[in-house]
Amino acid sequence: MDAREIIEMIAKAKKKTPIVAYIKGDLAGIDFSSFKFFGDEKFGILFGEYEDFKKLLEEHKEKIEDYHLEVKARNSALPLADITKYKARIEPGAIIRDMVEIGEGAVIMMGAVINVGAVIGEGTMIDMNAVIGGRAIIGKKCHIGAGAVIAGVIEPPSAKPVVIEDEVVVGANAVILEGVTVGKGAVVAAGAVVTKDVPPYTVVAGVPARVIKQIDERTKEKTKIVDELRNLE
């Protein structure tokens, strides 16, 4: 997705502050048409917008005895994705923005964050607390380690997105900076900071990362992707 398209969409989107409110009181006769309402004349649960709830409280303060408010976001421009559309394993606590592509058999672990415009290939695992920035492109059968950061490039809009090709393994807490391409089958060591392109089938390590060797059979065995973890049945 083009950065300028994302920027224009965010700029023009109606900003939302979604809430869940639990209210009790004499609720008979109150107009809840601005909300999704579940309840009866004494207690109800409301899903809606904060400004609408403020107005409701002001208009019916004599009837509402008590309430508890949960604010999900403030002036949010983009919703979270409907994860039911993905043929992937998505664990509790993952945060995925709308307009993210996730391939079949991918695995998104607890605490992972994936921003708008990102693409996750088939069979790729995004491990716990990894951050995939806006417009990042990750290929098939990759493993992005726990706590890794794949930089996003929505601002500035001219920046080139990160591209991680197929069958790449990125170690825990590694950082891939804007504009970098990591070639097919490469391995990025844990904690590395990658500032320039990584050739295919090489191992890079360090800060800044540099090539330390070519992929060999021992490295392949240590970084092997386990297909059983991608099984959705």
From Swiss-Prot:
GO molecular function, one term: tetrahydrodipicolinate N-acetyltransferase activity
EC annotation from Swiss-Prot or TrEMBL: 2.3.1.89
Keywords: Acyltransferase, Amino-acid biosynthesis, Diaminopimelate biosynthesis, Lysine biosynthesis, Repeat, Transferase
Keyword match Amino-acid biosynthesis: yes
CDD domains: LbH_THP_succinylT
Pathway(s) of this molecule: Amino-acid biosynthesis; L-lysine biosynthesis via DAP pathway; LL-2,6-diaminopimelate from (S)-tetrahydrodipicolinate (acetylase route): step 1/3
Family recorded in the similarity comment: Belongs to the transferase hexapeptide repeat family. DapH subfamily.
Protein name per its UniProtKB record: 2,3,4,5-tetrahydropyridine-2,6-dicarboxylate N-acetyltransferase
Species assigned in the record: Thermotoga petrophila (strain ATCC BAA-488 / DSM 13995 / JCM 10881 / RKU-1)
Lineage of the species this protein comes from: Bacteria, Thermotogati, Thermotogota, Thermotogae, Thermotogales
